[in-house]
């Protein structure tokens, strides 16, 4: 019996917004990952199973073939580097933006103009480094894994680089968005070997995802 395809997803917004794309392929995940303790979830298609992993680990599972394909944010893929992955489709889900934010009242533009060296907290170190280097801004980057908004409030950093959707969390912590680095959305990523060896099995899912992401439905 042929082993089922494995799709790597992370909990939360990406999982929720991938569900309609799976529906477009005629597939339903059998269990809700927010309620189930299982990390391998069957689907209504015996040829597909879903594994639930951390968002930052999706590219690694796909690159090394533990998953045949997955859904990951552009932010995660940029930090990962994209090696061993084929990225055929921007799914246009989990949309937000990566931005620089500072405490309200901090004159970011003037600090940059004066050539000040800024401490910036972020989990997107590589992307932030490239952004500031391209703009000639001098920074010391501090790697954090969460609660980014806290860093400027306690004097750890002058600014943060983080994902922003509505901006509500920034506002609640008296921070303001001063610069958008790039728009972010989630992409379908496919293991390159799987694309060659399992193309026939993958193709219906890739086609359905592409149609659904473009608003074509099933």
From Swiss-Prot:
Pfam families: HisG. GO terms for cellular component: cytoplasm. The keyword Glycosyltransferase applies. Pathway: Amino-acid biosynthesis; L-histidine biosynthesis; L-histidine from 5-phospho-alpha-D-ribose 1-diphosphate: step 1/9. The keyword Cytoplasm applies. It catalyses: 1-(5-phospho-beta-D-ribosyl)-ATP + diphosphate = 5-phospho-alpha-D-ribose 1-diphosphate + ATP. It is an enzyme of class 2 (transferase). Its EC number is 2.4.2.17. Lacks the C-terminal regulatory region which is replaced by HisZ. Catalyzes the condensation of ATP and 5-phosphoribose 1-diphosphate to form N'-(5'-phosphoribosyl)-ATP (PR-ATP). Has a crucial role in the pathway because the rate of histidine biosynthesis seems to be controlled primarily by regulation of HisG enzymatic activity. PANTHER family: ATP PHOSPHORIBOSYLTRANSFERASE (PTHR21403:SF8), ATP PHOSPHORIBOSYLTRANSFERASE ATP-PRTASE (PTHR21403). Belongs to the ATP phosphoribosyltransferase family. Short subfamily. This is ATP phosphoribosyltransferase. It comes from Burkholderia thailandensis (strain ATCC 700388 / DSM 13276 / CCUG 48851 / CIP 106301 / E264).
């Amino acid at each position: 019996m042929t082993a089922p395809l494995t799709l790597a997803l992370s909990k939360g917004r990406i999982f929720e917004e991938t569900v309609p794309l799976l529906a477009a392929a005629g597939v339903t995940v059998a269990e809700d990952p927010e309620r189930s303790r299982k990390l391998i979830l069957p689907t209504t298609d015996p040829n597909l199973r879903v594994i639930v992993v951390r968002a930052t680990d999706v590219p690694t599972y796909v690159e090394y073939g533990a998953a045949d394909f997955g859904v990951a944010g552009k932010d995660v893929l940029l930090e990962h580097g994209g090696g061993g992955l084929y990225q055929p489709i921007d799914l246009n889900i989990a949309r937000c933006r990566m931005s620089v934010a500072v405490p309200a009242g901090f004159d970011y533009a003037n600090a940059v103009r004066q050539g000040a060296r800024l401490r910036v907290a972020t989990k997107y170190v590589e992307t932030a480094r490239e952004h500031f280097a391209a703009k000639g801004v001098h920074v010391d980057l501090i790697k954090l894994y969460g609660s980014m908004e806290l860093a400027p409030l306690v004097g750890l950093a002058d600014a943060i680089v983080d994902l922003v959707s509505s901006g509500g969390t920034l506002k609640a912590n008296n921070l303001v968005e001063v610069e958008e680095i790039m728009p972010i959305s989630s992409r379908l990523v496919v293991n390159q070997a799987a694309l060659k060896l399992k193309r026939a099995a993958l193709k219906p899912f890739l086609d359905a995802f592409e149609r659904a992401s473009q608003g074509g439905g099933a």
